[in-house]
């Protein structure tokens, strides 16, 4: 849970449909990446409390011994999104396993998923395109209730049903491929309104077809978390501890 409109809307939505079920326990997870002035734990705590959901908090510094600010100071901000997203997934999965959580709900919307697909294409990352992360051993399965909902509609849902969230842009996002793709996709989608839906559908089909053999999952020798192929989170950890 970031404290923004997407994660706030998701938590409200899940509480509304699952809150009365005795066989389901709902938790919110907040991870502090260590970016000065970007995360305010009080905001996420207030949102979780107002909805009536227990909040689990952790940070890159506590789990990995490094913050994104420290990484950027040593390596620059060009690849900050790669480090941040990869390590977020690692820490999130670790928290879920530690607390016996059986499903992780993500606030990713249509815009996010379409952008991520294009980023993987531009980077030539076939493994991320063709093999879902939660197919790996010990990776907690993920659900994305807002997958086909445009970002604007998710934001409206949050505004109409609750408040207290923040809209804050990461200070390192200005120099990343993700930001360029986001801008490019929005401009193209303005002229061709079905583009984002088409990209998300393409991504779903690519995963289901499994058009190329991919390496089996392994266990990271440094952190004990699952990894596969050339994209391994333990490689990030090694880099972090050598910056």
Region annotations inferred by a language model:
Residues 25, 128-243:
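ATP/NTP-dependent adenylation/nucleotidyl-transfer catalytic domains that generate, transfer
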Residues 1-131, 135-139, 148-162:
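ATP-dependent adenylation/nucleotidyltransferase module used to activate substrates
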